[in-house]
Amino acid sequence: MAGALAGAGAAVVLVGRRKAELQSAAEIIRESGGQAVPVTADLSARERLPEIARRCQQPFGTVEILVNAAGVNLREPADKISFKSWDLTLNLNLAVPFFLAREFVSGMRKKGYGRIINIASLQSSRAFTNGLAYGASKAGVCQLTRAMAEAWSRDGIMCNAIAPGFFPTALTAPVFDDPQTERWAAEQTAVGRNGRLEDLGGITVFFAAPASNFITGQTLHIDGGFTAK
């Protein structure tokens, strides 16, 4: 997603906890002719979000496009979910996207242009085994996106969500590490395969661009037709 935005001309700030991975991703973008700067930070620390937002705006100025891609899925059985794991999941997946976005809204409002792209999930509308807390958080993302749109779209800030199907990421490693489960997931789609990371690039650029000027509060499933069946 970051690579697609950089390829479309955006100057990208990559934020996360894993310094080496961030630096590597930024270097790949720069080698391809794009602009990218890594910012190492723990987004789950809500009290530090104002500071993180300031750091994000130092390299290139006002943030006009925010992709809320941080997330966690602990895959715990319902009977084993603790208050701690529930709070961790709901905090990072649902609270942080709102409070981080709010840090950038004033700058977007002054520019008269802003794009907030949240990450929903198949579990926003489907119940999966050991996905109670994660599913609750991702269902919340869809309503959060609508509420953000209602609050900020009149200021030129469009708020939409992408709901990916099964893509090979750190969160879905348990699926892709098991050939049988990976095959099952592919068979649930209409196209007969799981997602490739490049499949997310086009919709990310579209939601970030002026082409989406009249689209807000929407959640679009990028799942190869998983939810169509």
Specify the residue positions occupied by each region the protein language model found.
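Canonical Rossmann dinucleotide-binding motif of NAD(H)/NADP(H)-dependent dehydrogenases/reductases
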Residues: 1-13
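Alpha-helical segment proximal to the catalytic Tyr-Lys
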Residues: 106, 150-154, 213
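Short C-terminal tail/terminal secondary-structure segment
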Residues: 126, 205, 216-229
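Substrate-binding pocket helix/loop in short-chain dehydrogenase/reductase
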Residues: 77-78, 82-90, 116, 185
